[in-house]
Amino acid sequence: MAVYNYDVVVLGSGPAGEGAAMNAAKAGRKVAMVDDRRQVGGNCTHLGTIPSKALRHSVRQIMQFNTNPMFRAIGEPRWFSFPDVLKSAEKVISKQVASRTGYYARNRVDVFFGTGSFADEQTVEVVCPNGVVEKLNAKHIIIATGSRPYRPADIDFHHPRVYDSDTILSLSHTPRKLIVYGAGVIGCEYASIFSGLGVLVELVDNRGQLLSFLDSEISQALSYHFSNNNITVRHNEEYERVEGLDNGVILHLKSGKKIKADALLWCNGRTGNTDKLGLENIGIKVNSRGQIEVDEAYRTTVPNIYGAGDVIGWPSLASAAHDQGRSAAGSIVDNGSWRFVNDVPTGIYTIPEISSIGKNEQELTQAKVPYEVGKAFFKGMARAQIAGEPQGMLKILFHRETLEILGVHCFGYQASEIVHIGQAIMNQPGEHNNLKYFVNTTFNYPTMAEAYRVAAYDGLNRLF
């Protein structure tokens, strides 16, 4: 058994692990990375964010071709199979792996491929694919092993018609009708993707409103858009059992309803990847979803062991995970890079996409904050008209007395890009966070960014 000594060992090479390893390495620490896949990138690169967003991009291109009258001169609308569309995602994955492999090499991070588990509080044993066991001793260890889809024991996920958000990428045909159980972020994103391919989608939600953490107006806009695009949303429903057939699947609901489709995609929650870490050897406990509890410094109950990313739960975003990993390493190296990641933009890649940061109207009303609203509808924006993307809006919430920006919410074309302008101004200290910034700033024309000026004028016009 080979033995190696490090300052920091990171378990998992997803966004959180990468952020942790890079920050520790750049601070001069000797760092090792352990991942159970034979390529770096984690589930984010191989099964989650990257393939699903590449898939979404391809579907949007197909939708644009099929709905833009200009293209009728060269042919009728065309439909592509799911496996054919998925091929574009595979190219992006390989490019991402190559880039990230280069990051670790340039920063002299040693990468071990194999299953890592705790022998004790300062030792990780890695079982390599060839069966060789290597021992890594470390002063500090960061757990960034991510998550996987939650699988209830009473559902047969080995049935060829039943999928989760990982296995759906192996779908070898295009279903005519698909049941998506779970209307969270992942469920809504995949509902959009399959709807864009012409698939009839039944989206089953166990709550009364889609993505209830969003501003209610944005959530309602998404619901309306879904209803116009072959997506039937069934609220306040819970499954009783899933019946797999040779030619499809039947979802039995507790309300007595039954839904039949060609396939079922399970998108109801995720579980932390902690079951193979040997946490019982070091006294770290996990909750019912396999997640680790950490403090504001991302430290677990064992002082030299930290956690970051999906494995610690909220907010379970790749963007936040990277910052959490970087901050966990910052707590170790004490180079001023630590911060508690709590106010991050939400990016939801439905079609159209959604993004937001800060407070929503429900929260401000409940807190009795005197706020006002400014809106810009994309149907009136020149850039949106040029792009043929008239659906959507930008919504700014601001304090009616100080003009401080309290929240930014966007639904539509380039929403995940647009939100960062508002984020930058909201992060300015004191009186520099002010709605008038958007009135006094010159925006390129035509751009989607100038929606901020339109929304700012709309908000100021509401004051009296």
Swiss-Prot record:
Chief localisation class: cytoplasm
Keywords: Cytoplasm, FAD, Flavoprotein, NAD, NADP, Oxidoreductase
EC number of this enzyme: 1.6.1.1
Needed co-factor(s): FAD
Pfam families, per the entry: Pyr_redox_2 (PF07992), Pyr_redox_dim (PF02852)
Keyword Oxidoreductase: yes
Transmembrane segments: none
One annotated GO biological process: 2-oxoglutarate metabolic process
Residue positions binding FAD: D35, D36, R37, R38, Q39, V40, G41, G42, N43, C44
Catalyzed chemical reaction(s): NAD(+) + NADPH = NADH + NADP(+)
Enzyme class: oxidoreductase
Co-factor: note: Binds 1 FAD per subunit.
UniProt cross-references to InterPro entries, sorted A to Z: Class-I_Pyr_Nuc-Dis_Oxidored (IPR050151), FAD/NAD-bd_sf (IPR036188), FAD/NAD-binding_dom (IPR023753), FAD/NAD-linked_Rdtase_dimer_sf (IPR016156), Pyr_nuc-diS_OxRdtase (IPR001100), Pyr_nucl-diS_OxRdtase_dimer (IPR004099), STH_gammaproteobact (IPR022962)
Location in or out of the cell: Cytoplasm
Function: Conversion of NADPH, generated by peripheral catabolic pathways, to NADH, which can enter the respiratory chain for energy generation.
PANTHER family referenced in this protein's UniProt entry, alphabetically: DISULFIDE OXIDOREDUCTASE, SOLUBLE PYRIDINE NUCLEOTIDE TRANSHYDROGENASE
This protein's name: Soluble pyridine nucleotide transhydrogenase
Record lineage: Bacteria, Pseudomonadati, Pseudomonadota, Gammaproteobacteria, Pseudomonadales
